[in-house]
From Swiss-Prot:
Expressed by the venom duct. Pfam families: Chi-conotoxin (PF16981). This is Conotoxin Im5.1. InterPro entries: T-conotoxin (IPR031565). Contains 2 disulfide bonds that can be either 'C1-C3, C2-C4' or 'C1-C4, C2-C3', since these disulfide connectivities have been observed for conotoxins with cysteine framework V (for examples, see AC P0DQQ7 and AC P81755). Keywords: Amidation, Disulfide bond, Secreted, Signal, Toxin. Residues 20-48 form a propeptide. It comes from Conus imperialis (Imperial cone).
Amino acid sequence: MYCLPVFIILLLLISSAPSTPPQPRNKDRVHLISLLDNHKQILQRDWNSCCGKNPGCCPWGK
């Protein structure tokens, strides 16, 4: 007899819980890819400035 009110309260709580629409998986992957591309561009810029001043610090040996 005590279970019925608890069950009804749980049903009301579940139905009133906020629901978020599912996000597509590709959106997260696109952000990750753009983050990695930005990281590569920053490293390339740093290497270019280093190679202009000191060719010995270049990773490709210019």
